[in-house]
Amino acid sequence: EPVAIRPEEVEIIDGYVGRGYALSRQEELNFIRDFARMEGVLLDPVYTGKCMYGFTQEVKKGSFAGSKNVLFLHTGGLFGLFPARELFTGLRKG
């Protein structure tokens, strides 16, 4: 059964673009590397890595405390991984 989502149920938080398109701060790169190590999920530094970084910052701030369901949609970012492969070299989970 399809899920209905009303526009007023969607919140877009756009304050985590960092230095700009494809320009990551060291803090974001460290987060992406640590996230890959801990969760086994690779995030590109152009889109999804910045988005997950922002999402976790919002969780820490309590932005979703009153929410019953919160969804993070990982949209891919595969091609953004190739130029950033050195971030993931030698990573092991754990």
State the predicted function of each range.
Residues 56-94:
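Phosphate-binding loop/pocket of nucleotide- and phosphate-handling active sites
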